[in-house]
């Protein structure tokens, strides 16, 4: 593992690391914020998954999360959004290929060789973080847009792994919207039954009551993708039918940008702290 950057930040450290991923068959970069140590108790971790076109640095530089994370004593881990490199399959579109991994395990050539972001986030990256940093095994997960989709499916597919989950403007029903249909048909093939295991709404309908965890979703009502790509009301209906403890907040005037995330990230960190720090 190689440190690329380190910066003092709110009495903690903002770092960027590169490591060779055996899951993705390429070098990967992640960012991590280490809050100032408090006592001898290892701090919990919040994983943040970013959206289309992003890498590990967007949240780090734009969301302004470090101040509150330092206050609460929460480690922030920001992975990249896809495998990277000249040998990694790519596409000219912004919504496919590098920068658009959709946090799933691809089954179709040429994508299946590298595009296993789900396995990377479930197994390899947490194991690496646990082995290299002084952190507890308590963790939560959050994300934006494609990353909100990623956070929700990670939580729904892994009962007991996360204390809580949150999302900003998530793609909740990828099986039914253009971004998801394009990605799933490319990465997973044309069998739409195979798509369902990567769809938050389908996973929530299939969930067990004892596996429900506290869930917070914020959505701006001035988001240009709200009607066509995001459709949070579909997940809210699934949550209602399953009595899943989910809060959906519609935020007037906010769009899809990091200005929206920066406005409400403190709420999300304090939401997760209620459960992470128990």
Curated annotation (Swiss-Prot):
Enzyme Commission number, as recorded: 3.1.2.12
Cysteine disulfide partners in this protein: none
Catalytic reactions of this protein: S-formylglutathione + H2O = formate + glutathione + H(+)
Keyword Hydrolase among UniProt keywords: yes
Keyword Hydrolase: yes
Keywords: Hydrolase, Serine esterase
List of catalytic residues: 145 (charge relay system), 223 (charge relay system), 256 (charge relay system)
Protein's UniProt name: S-formylglutathione hydrolase YeiG
Species for this entry: Escherichia coli O6:K15:H31 (strain 536 / UPEC)
């Amino acid at each position: 593992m190689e440190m690329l950057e380190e910066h003092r930040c709110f009495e903690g450290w903002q770092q960027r690391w590169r490591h060779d991923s055996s899951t993705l068959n390429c070098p990967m970069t992640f960012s991590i914020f280490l809050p100032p140590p408090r006592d001898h108790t290892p701090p919990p971790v919040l994983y943040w998954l970013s959206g289309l076109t992003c890498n590990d640095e967007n949240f780090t530089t734009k969301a302004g999360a470090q101040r509150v994370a330092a206050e609460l004593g929460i480690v922030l881990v920001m992975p990249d959004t896809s495998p990277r490199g000249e040998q990694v399959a790519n596409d000219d579109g912004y919504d496919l290929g590098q920068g658009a991994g959709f946090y799933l395990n691809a089954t179709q050539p040429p994508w299946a060789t590298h595009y296993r972001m789900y396995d990377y986030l479930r197994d390899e990256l947490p194991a690496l973080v646990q082995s290299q940093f002084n952190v507890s095994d308590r963790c939560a997960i959050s994300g934006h847009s494609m990353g909100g989709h990623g956070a929700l499916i990670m939580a729904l597919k892994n009962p007991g792994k996360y204390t809580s989950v949150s999302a900003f403007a998530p793609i909740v029903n990828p099986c039914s919207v253009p971004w998801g249909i394009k990605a799933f048909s490319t990465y997973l093939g044309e069998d739409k039954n195979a798509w369902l295991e990567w769809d938050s709404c389908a996973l929530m309908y299939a969930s067990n009551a004892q596996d429900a965890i506290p869930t917070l979703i914020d959505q701006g009502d001035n988001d240009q993708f709200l009607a066509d790509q995001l459709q949070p009301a579909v997940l809210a209906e699934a949550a209602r039918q399953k009595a899943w403890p989910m809060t959906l907040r519609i935020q007037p005037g906010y769009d899809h940008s990091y200005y929206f995330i920066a406005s409400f990230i403190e709420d999300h960190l304090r939401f997760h702290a209620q459960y992470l720090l128990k």
